[in-house]
C-alpha cells in the first residue's frame, strides 16, 4: 500500500458516521489469532526452562531462563548489551515473580557494564549480571572492586548498626533490599566472541567473517578472575549451573560463573523464538 492510500484510508476511518468503531468478527478473529501465537511462543519458552530442545546445555536462552527462575524475588537482574539484553527480553515471561531489571548502554555500547552492575548491587542488594565475554573483557578491571566491597563489609561489621547515625540507617534501609546476602553474581555466557554478528549476511564470507566480525579472544577467564580474588566456577550443563548459581546467592561481594556456549549458529538456535 502506498503512503497516500494509507493516509486516505485512515481519514475515511476517522470520518465514519456510524459512531465509534466496534470490534467486528474479523477484528476478534485477528486478535484471537495473535493470542494463540503468543501462547504457543510462551510454551516454547517455558520448555527451554525445562531443559527441552535439541541441545539445552549449549543454548544461551536456557541459562537465561534458569536465572529468571532461580533469582530471588525482588532482586536485581542486570542485562548487558548485545545478546544478553535480547535474551532477557526474549525469555522473560510474565509471572508472579518481580525482579528489578536494569541495563546500561555506554558510549561504545558495552563499556562500563560490569562496574555499573556492581554499583547497582550496592543499592538494590542481591544482583545478577548476565553478560557476554566481550562486554566482560571491556570492563574486566571492575573486578578490582571486590577488594573495596570486602573492606566496606569489614568496616560495617566493626561499626555495627548500633553506631550508625539516623541518616546512615535511613540510607542503608533505602538502598538495601531483603534479598539475601548483598552481592552480585556475574553469569558469563562465553561464546568466545561477538556471536550476535552471526546473524549478519556477511556470515557467508568465511575467509574473513570470523576474524573481523566474530573476533574470538580465547581468554582464560578462570585465571583472569583469580587475579582479583573473585570466587569462580565453570559449568557445562544446566544441572551444574543450577547448583553453582544457588550457591552464589549466599556469597557476599562478587562471584563469577562461566558458561561456555557456541560462537556460531546463533541464528539457528534462536529461530524458534524470534
Model-inferred region functions:
Residues 10-21, 38-45, 49, 68-71, ...:
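Structural signal for hydrophobic packing residues in well-ordered secondary-structure cores
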Residues 3, 20-27, 49-57, 78, ...:
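Hydrophobic alpha-helical scaffolding
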Residues 2-9, 26, 33, 59-67, ...:
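General structural feature for long, well-ordered alpha-helical segments within catalytic domains
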Amino acid at each position: 500500500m502506498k503512503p497516500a492510500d494509507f493516509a486516505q484510508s485512515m481519514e475515511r476511518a476517522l470520518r465514519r458516521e456510524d459512531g465509534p468503531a466496534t470490534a467486528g468478527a474479523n477484528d476478534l478473529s485477528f486478535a484471537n489469532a495473535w493470542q494463540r501465537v503468543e501462547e504457543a511462543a510462551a510454551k516454547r519458552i517455558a520448555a527451554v526452562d525445562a531443559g527441552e530442545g535439541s541441545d539445552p546445555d549449549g543454548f544461551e536462552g536456557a541459562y537465561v531462563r534458569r536465572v529468571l527462575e532461580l533469582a530471588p524475588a525482588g532482586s536485581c537482574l542486570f542485562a548487558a548489551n548485545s545478546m544478553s539484553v535480547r535474551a532477557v527480553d526474549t525469555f522473560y515471561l510474565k509471572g508472579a515473580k518481580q525482579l528489578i531489571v536494569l541495563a546500561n548502554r555506554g558510549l561504545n555500547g558495552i563499556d562500563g557494564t560490569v562496574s555499573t552492575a556492581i554499583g547497582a548491587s550496592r543499592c538494590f542488594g542481591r544482583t545478577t549480571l548476565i553478560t557476554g565475554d566481550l562486554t566482560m573483557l571491556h570492563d574486566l578491571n571492575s573486578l578490582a572492586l571486590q577488594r573495596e566491597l570486602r573492606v566496606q563489609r569489614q568496616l560495617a561489621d566493626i561499626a555495627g548498626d548500633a553506631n550508625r547515625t539516623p541518616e546512615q540507617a535511613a540510607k542503608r534501609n533505602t538502598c538495601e533490599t531483603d534479598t539475601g546476602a548483598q552481592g552480585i553474581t556475574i553469569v558469563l555466557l562465553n561464546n568466545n566472541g561477538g556471536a550476535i554478528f552471526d546473524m549478519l549476511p556477511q556470515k557467508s564470507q568465511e575467509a574473513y567473517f570470523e576474524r573481523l566480525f566474530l573476533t574470538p579472544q580465547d581468554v582464560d577467564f578462570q585465571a583472569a578472575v583469580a587475579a582479583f580474588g573473585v570466587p569462580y566456577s565453570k559449568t557445562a550443563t544446566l544441572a551444574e549451573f543450577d547448583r553453582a548459581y544457588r550457591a552464589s546467592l549466599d556469597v557476599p561481594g562478587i562471584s563469577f560463573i562461566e558458561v561456555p556456549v557456541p560462537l556460531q549458529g546463533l541464528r539457528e538456535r534462536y529461530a524458534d523464538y524470534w
